[in-house]
C-alpha cells in the first residue's frame, strides 16, 4: 500500500509544481481540522488534493484525499483514497479513458483495494452554467483483506460528474460512481457546495457517502462523512 500511495502523492506533487510553471494545470488543495479538549479529546484532520489538465487531445485528472480521526489519543479512523484518470479525446465530446484507483482504510475490514478500468466517456451537458460528464468501463479490482488474503474480481464502472455554477462565487458539485463486481459493489457519492471567500481561497461544505455491498463480519457497509474545509486553487 505504501508504495502505491507514495506514487500517487509524488504524481500529485509533480503535476501541481508543473501547474505553477506552465500554467497548463488547474489544481486545488483543501484542508479541514477540528480539535476538542476537556471531557473529550478529539482531533479530526482532512486533506484533499486535485489537479487536472484539459488539453487538445488528452485530459489528465488526479485526486488524493486523506482523513484521520483520533479520540482520547486513540486513532478511530484513518483512510486514504487516490486515483488518476487519462482521457483520449475523440470528436464531439466523446473520449476513451483509463483509470487507476487505490483506497486504504484500516477500519473497513480491508487493508487496501486497488482497481483499474478502461472504457468510454462522454460530456452529456455543457452550457454556460452546468456540465454533466458520464462514463462507463470494464476493469478489475484487487482487495487485500485484513487477514492478509487477496481477492480479485471483474468490475463494471459507471460514473457521473455534475457541476452547476450558481454564481461567480458559488459552485455546486455532485459526483456519483458505482463499481459493480462479481463479488461486491462499491458506490461513492460526493455532494459539495463551495463559496469563494477571497481571491483563490474558498470554503467548501461536502457530504461523502461510501457503500460496499459485501464487507467482513463486524464492519459497517456504509460510511458517511460531512466536512467543512478551506480550498486554495491555483
Residue locations for each model-derived region?
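Predominantly the C-terminal beta-signal and adjacent terminal strand-loop region
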Residues: 184-234
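Repeated loop/turn-to-beta-strand initiation elements of outer-membrane beta-barrel proteins
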Residues: 25, 57-62, 93-96, 128-132, ...
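Hydrophobic, lipid-facing positions within transmembrane beta-strands of outer-membrane proteins
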Residues: 27, 43-49, 64, 78-84, ...
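Outer-membrane beta-barrel proteins
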Residues: 53-57, 90-92, 121-126, 142-144, ...
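Transmembrane beta-strands of outer-membrane beta-barrel proteins
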Residues: 28-32, 48, 61-65, 83, ...
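Transmembrane beta-strands of outer-membrane beta-barrel pores
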Residues: 33-37, 55, 66-70, 102-106, ...
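Residues on the lipid-exposed face of transmembrane beta-strands in outer-membrane beta-barrel proteins
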Residues: 29-33, 47-53, 84-88, 118-122, ...
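Solvent-exposed loop/turn segments connecting transmembrane beta-strands
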Residues: 35-43, 71-77, 104-112, 146-152, ...
